[in-house]
Amino acid sequence: MGANVLIMAGGTGGHVFPALACAREFQARGYTVHWLGTPRGIENDLVPAAGLELHRINATGLRGKGKLSLLKAPFMLLKSVWQARAIIRRLRPVCVVGFGGYVTGPGGLAAKLAGVPVIVHEQNAVAGTANRLLVPFAARVCEAFPDTFTLSDSRRTTGNPVRSELFLETPRPALAGRKARLLILGGSLGAEPLNKLLPEALAQVAADLRPEVFHQAGRNHDEVTAERYRAAGVDAQVQPFIKDMAQAYGWADLVVCRAGALTISELAAAGLPSMLVPLPHAIDDHQTRNADYLAREGAAFLMPQRTTGAADLAARLTEVLMQPQRLEQMAQAARRLAKPEATRSVVDTCLEVAHG
């Protein structure tokens, strides 16, 4: 294999999945990919399963920590930077690419100290703490949404790397003569407010207008959610997980979900209209900013959790289900926002920096 590239990403799938897509692209171009993570994040399952070598450093966040932890923070940071620098000196990568998570801060600083160019990719419309702090040290900044880094002269709007199979080419069958299909996504852990809200809302939609329902309720939430639908008199298929998202998106005409960065990018890739209920406690309210990206272009409805009740959601569902042409217009708007070249664009940017 060729020269080494070091990817830094950890903690959640929102950071790790785009990084994995880029890792595959680097490999396709002949590079050897190494990964810098932490001992506890989701990367410990996903990265080895992808056949990549995972190097770990001890890195933790600072938000919400007590005074003792904050006093220890400078020493912990020095330790994690030292660990990362030792790994970087051994691997001698041509570039280091940070996708977010606690590992990105010390890893990026170590790369800068070692003279290795750093590239940052931010998935959300509002930059995470680690990426925000790393930007001054970065040779190039890739943003998924326009104007995330308005003060950076080195930014490039690339979009979020999304699996190629989610870019659906086949047009959906017309709604004439059939029921609409509603996909509800609660995430792997489940979004309990959505699990409670949707059965109540759908019960208030006229039976002849009510869509077919597929509800992904999350681990340990499927049985109680299915019971809520039964109690509400609404037919629904409820599952804890969805293994094949391409199939699920291809089935759906409309999606109700949270507004994580990857979800937003996947909805655009699949050309799907949506009703977005951002997680109200997300750091810096970044999900609302993510959702606004689709909403202001007419591809989604932004429905804040604090002000959206069952009657509000039922009214909105009724409105769009009575206007199939509205759903099609929203689908076209979503498709216009898709970034099918995002993975290639991020990797191109990295290699321009590495070999420029």
From Swiss-Prot:
Q: Show the disulfide pairing.
A: none
Pathway listed for it is: Cell wall biogenesis; peptidoglycan biosynthesis
Main subcellular location: membrane
Q: Does the keyword Transferase apply?
A: yes
Superkingdom field:
Bacteria
UniProt feature coiled coil, ranges: none
Per UniProt, UDP-N-acetyl-alpha-D-glucosamine binds at 12-14, 124, 163, 188, 242, 287
Query: What's an example GO BP annotation here?
Result: cell division
Task: Identify the EC number(s).
Answer: 2.4.1.227
Catalytic reaction list: di-trans,octa-cis-undecaprenyl diphospho-N-acetyl-alpha-D-muramoyl-L-alanyl-D-glutamyl-meso-2,6-diaminopimeloyl-D-alanyl-D-alanine + UDP-N-acetyl-alpha-D-glucosamine = di-trans,octa-cis-undecaprenyl diphospho-[N-acetyl-alpha-D-glucosaminyl-(1->4)]-N-acetyl-alpha-D-muramoyl-L-alanyl-D-glutamyl-meso-2,6-diaminopimeloyl-D-alanyl-D-alanine + UDP + H(+)
Q: Where in the cell is it found?
A: Cell inner membrane
Query: Does the record carry Cell cycle as a key word?
Result: yes
Q: Which UniProt keywords apply?
A: Cell cycle, Cell division, Cell inner membrane, Cell membrane, Cell shape, Cell wall biogenesis/degradation, Glycosyltransferase, Membrane, Peptidoglycan synthesis, Transferase
**What molecular function does GO assign, one term?**
UDP-N-acetyl-D-glucosamine:N-acetylmuramoyl-L-alanyl-D-glutamyl-meso-2,6-diaminopimelyl-D-alanyl-D-alanine-diphosphoundecaprenol 4-beta-N-acetylglucosaminlytransferase activity
Q: GO cellular component terms?
A: plasma membrane
What is the topology of this protein in the membrane according to its UniProt annotation? Peripheral membrane protein
The UniProt entry, under Pfam families, shows:
Glyco_tran_28_C (PF04101), Glyco_transf_28 (PF03033)
Family matches, as HAMAP family: MurG
Q: Family membership, please give it.
A: Belongs to the glycosyltransferase 28 family. MurG subfamily.
Show the PANTHER family listed in the entry. GLYCOSYLTRANSFERASE, UDP-N-ACETYLGLUCOSAMINE--N-ACETYLMURAMYL-(PENTAPEPTIDE) PYROPHOSPHORYL-UNDECAPRENOL N-ACETYLGLUCOSAMINE TRANSFERASE 1
Report the protein's function.
Cell wall formation. Catalyzes the transfer of a GlcNAc subunit on undecaprenyl-pyrophosphoryl-MurNAc-pentapeptide (lipid intermediate I) to form undecaprenyl-pyrophosphoryl-MurNAc-(pentapeptide)GlcNAc (lipid intermediate II).
**In its UniProt entry, what is this protein called?**
UDP-N-acetylglucosamine--N-acetylmuramyl-(pentapeptide) pyrophosphoryl-undecaprenol N-acetylglucosamine transferase
Q: Give the organism the record lists.
A: Pseudomonas fluorescens (strain Pf0-1)
Lineage per the UniProt record: Bacteria, Pseudomonadati, Pseudomonadota, Gammaproteobacteria, Pseudomonadales
